[in-house]
Amino acid sequence: SFLIENNNWSEIMPVTKDFKTIDEQIAVLDSRQLKFKSKKKAAELLRKYNYFDLINGFESMLLKQGTPNKEYDDVYFEDFKDLFFFDMKLKKYTLAKIFDVESRLRTSIAYNFAETYCQTSADTMNYLNPAYYQAPPVTDTNLTNRFHHFDLFRTTQYWPNGNIRTRAFIDDLKREKEYVGQYENPPFWVTIKALPLGSLYYTFVFLNSTVKEKVLRDFGMELDDSAAFEQALFILKEMRNQCAHLELITRFKIKGKPSLNYFNDIKTKAGLARGDLFYIDVLKIFKLFGGIADIKREIAWFYFRLILKGRQKIADKAISKMGRKKLSVW
């Protein structure tokens, strides 16, 4: 692990940062009055995990306020360690919830679409035909463009000399995935497994009302809930990306998007915050799809463990950044 350090803290945007050894990283933290229970163990941790991941993500929450230079007041390196591993553990629970929703969505879309449009072998490949989906209104240029270039609808394109320029989606998939390539005409419930969550999200968006209503009923919702469900999927997609890139999910924050009605539908249905969305709002979305007792238990355990360490102020700051300061709200 290594640290890239800015030499001039008065600059808002540094040109670059200088490399620092593990010992130099600890010296920098020392100079900012960060306390250590064991510098040896701190060094071992910094060799395993990047300084940027361990320190930078949490420092704005723990730095002393109102000082021109970076400075800590009664903050320990071990506080950063506790926050970092809490975030890591929460990622595991969060991803498990998202994977569950994702798996159920794949199953529901494939089953209900096939039941409606792919009942015979002659109809097997109808899921690649945009005629069986609902095109967005032409006034929505962004969504219309996505529809016209959607993965499932991609056909083979040729150069004037007859050479292939781009392969059809299904042909590419047959080459990449052995379980798809074993079929001449792979059924939807096989190919849908290969779609990333982003493509799965748009597959739901582009379903017509007949299929969409069936999918929503599988999740205990009605067609009127379509916008809220779509917004929930988008938020979970963003959270999944944050987990996949090992970003801090305890600092998760998402602003409203005009194209998704600023998430107003899901805010109403799930009782989310009226402004920006935080981790607690993701938890409320999970509640629409199943239980959240395991995540709530993990948050409570983290909080009480820090109380026992005499670090309640750190726990308060952490859950406050996640959406609510009072544990009872969670």
Describe each region flagged by the PLM.
Residues 1-238, 250-330:
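Extended intrinsically disordered or low-complexity regions, especially N/C-terminal cytosolic tails and loops
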Residues 246:
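Acidic/aromatic/glycine-rich contiguous surface patches that form carbohydrate-binding/processing clefts
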